[in-house]
Amino acid sequence: SEMCIRDRALPVAEDRTGSTIAANTSRRVMSNYEVLPDGSAATIYSLQSLIVPVPKPEDDPVYKDGIKQDPVEVVSIWLGRDYLNMILNLKVSTGKGHTFGIVEDVSELKTNGIVNMLLYHDANSDEEYYNRRAYISVPLAQYIDEEHPGRTINIKFKYCTYDKDGSAVVSEKYCDPGFDYTPGQN
């Protein structure tokens, strides 16, 4: 097997995680690894699969039961390699059944180069006892304008979180200024 590091494929010398990924498939993961001194291969120490939700409009059938906005805390959020990446902190009991998605609004894309995104999070009635992290990587390449492929696109991201009193509120913290995505550059 091999892993792609910064657009360079490297054979895996040793996978200490015991993970298995089917042949001829790819998966977006976060990993701790070490490139061998001669640069010929890498040793993988840990792998974490990422949730990769493809943004869909509010009227998509996947949202037929409504837009769920159970609260999360954003630990970290950044642009990287044509993705909006984030680490979220969830309050969970079992941690099972949480569903994530991205609701997109592209009504301002052609005119102003803006994509509005809202985090869909259905905790599926999981009780809020413990902290657990979720790693999400939202693909952005579908917003590239074929006529102007280098055009910068402003990504505005909203999500539901907790206010200082512990009540759920929608945060627009990442809307002004948002994230300036330049295809192929960040």
Give each language-model segment a name.
Residues 3-5:
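Short, small-residue-biased leader/transition segments that mark boundaries at the very start
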Residues 16-30:
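Short nucleic-acid-contacting surface segments enriched for D/E, G, S/T with interspersed K/R
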Residues 34-60, 175:
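OB-fold/S1-family single-stranded nucleic acid-binding modules
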Residues 35-42, 158-170:
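Short acidic/polar inter-strand loop motif in beta-rich domains
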Residues 74-127:
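Short helix-loop boundary/capping segments
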Residues 129-140:
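Aromatic sugar-binding surface patches on proteins
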Residues 145-161:
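Short, surface-exposed ligand- or partner-binding patches at beta-edge/loop junctions that are enriched
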Residues 165-186:
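Short beta-strand elements
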